[in-house]
Amino acid sequence: VQMEVPFGVIFAYFMLKEKPTIRALIGIAIAFVGVYILTGSPNLDGKFIGIGLTILGSAVWALGQVMVKPLSKEIDPLALVAWLALFSGPILVMLSAIIDGNTINYLTNAKFDHWIIAIYIGFIMQPITYGCFYYVLKNNPLYKVLPIVTMGIPPTGLLAAIFLLGEKPTPELFIGGAIIIVGVILI
């Protein structure tokens, strides 16, 4: 939903004392208006849990990036990615076992191409992208870095939903999405 950026700016202000510009604050307000439109305002019937979890996920990711920023100044970016993976991997496997159940069955029955994709994401894509992100993050305020890093997510997700899942976008999606992107650009 691109709400990682406004949440990141807000958290960085309180936790890192990074003062956003007036333009960034206006951008945050505009982005929240876009989310209101995108989510089907004023009718949230049957959507509240999904929307709430999506926004919560954005906030948690942004909080994580704010917490990582001070570490990125002290630890090499690739080492930081490795340490985060070392601790988050087992936690995610445990959560999968609790929520999905039968995680061992999924792992033992995974096909060869699934393992290739997992290895590519875990050992090539993730270290390179997050390593570069943490390198840039250590020397720049969050409000300058997050919009650039996350700008490709909404169009990619929308196109994937349309072409891979056959979803039909609504006018609210386009209007709200455009407003969110304008807000993020201002940030």
Where in this protein do the model-derived segments appear?
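Hydrophobic core positions of alpha-helical segments in small-molecule transporters
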Residues: 3, 23-26, 49, 56, ...
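Hydrophobic/small/kink-forming positions within alpha-helical transmembrane segments
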Residues: 5-10, 36, 59-63, 93, ...
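Hydrophobic transmembrane alpha-helices of multi-pass small-molecule transport proteins
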Residues: 11, 20-40, 58, 172-187
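Membrane-interface helix termini and inter-helical loops of multi-pass transporters
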Residues: 36-49, 97-118, 162-171
